[in-house]
Structure formats: C-alpha cells, structure tokens
Amino acid sequence: MNKTSLPPIDSIDRQWYVVDAENQTLGRLATEVASILRGKNNPNFTPHLDTGDFVVVVNAEKIQVSGKKPQQKLYRRHSGRPGGMKVETFESLQERIPERIVEKAIKGMLPHNALGRQMYRKLKVYKGTEHPHSAQKPQPLQLNPSATAK
C-alpha cells in the first residue's frame, strides 16, 4: 500500500518567477501561470495544500488574443444594486485596466474555493516592465514556445 507523503508547510520553499506577457496569447499564458501558482511544477505537489510559487506578470497591456476577440470578448461586473450590470469589451478594458484581464483569466483557472483564493494572492500583475518585487530576486520564466502568439 502506498502512502501519500505530506510536506510540512514550513518546508515548502517558494520561488519567485517573473513572466513577460508581451506578445503572449492570453489563455496559453494563463494556463502556464495557473499551473505554477498551484504548484504542479513542484515534485512535492499535493492537491489539497498550497505548494505553489509566486508569479509576477509584467507587460500586461501587451497581451494578445486571436481573431475578433478584441471587439467581441466581453467582461461583465455587477455593483450589487438593481440594474448595476456593467459590460465592457476586451479593447476598452485593455485601455483602462490591462492587469484585470490577466488576473481574471488566471483566477478562473484556479480552484474556486478558499485554497484557490490563497493561491491567487501569490499572483502579481503589472502594466509595464517595472515591478516592486526585485528584492525577492524573481527568476525569468520562459513559457513553452507554443504559448507564444504568432
């Protein structure tokens, strides 16, 4: 009978990675980042523990989508009040708050429970190349070549 080894929470060594979103396809970038946030790249991955690493995404305003999605993909939010639904296209949201596009795509690929919320807190998304996490010495993360937009 095999026994599952549980890594102690203190022994989990979290790495910091920086990902450049320039000319990356939104969904392909989001799946790779979500996998790292979950910890699936670590040998001590455990589904019910947060074993993931920190990820800093830069150049969020340069993310790409294919086809007519810039004009047709819609982002909805609701104020909680009657008639408070706001709908915005990818293009207009990318002009206003490009970080939200990447955050929303990655958050949707994480578990929808308390553990997923804990994993989501390790994601940092910034417009432009500057970020305040240089003290953590994040390693540049090269995504799969197939994840690059053509």
UniProtKB/Swiss-Prot annotation:
Q: Which GO terms describe its cellular component?
A: cytosolic large ribosomal subunit
Q: Which UniProt keywords apply?
A: Ribonucleoprotein, Ribosomal protein
Q: Which InterPro entries match?
A: Ribosomal_uL13, Ribosomal_uL13_bac-type, Ribosomal_uL13_CS, Ribosomal_uL13_sf
Which portions of the sequence form the region Disordered?
A: 127-150
* Listed GO MF terms: mRNA binding; structural constituent of ribosome
Answer whether the UniProt record assigns the keyword Glycoprotein to this protein: no
Query: Which Pfam families does this UniProt record tie to the protein?
Result: Ribosomal_L13 (PF00572)
Lineage: superkingdom: Bacteria
Is Plastid set as a keyword in this record?
no
Question: What biological-process GO terms show up in the record?
Answer: negative regulation of translation; translation
Q: Where is the composition biased (Polar residues)?
A: 136-150
How does it associate, per the subunit comment?
Part of the 50S ribosomal subunit.
> According to its UniProt record, which protein family does this protein belong to?
Belongs to the universal ribosomal protein uL13 family.
Q: What function does this protein fulfil?
A: This protein is one of the early assembly proteins of the 50S ribosomal subunit, although it is not seen to bind rRNA by itself. It is important during the early stages of 50S assembly.
Q: What is this protein called?
A: Large ribosomal subunit protein uL13
Can you name the source organism?
Synechococcus sp. (strain CC9902)
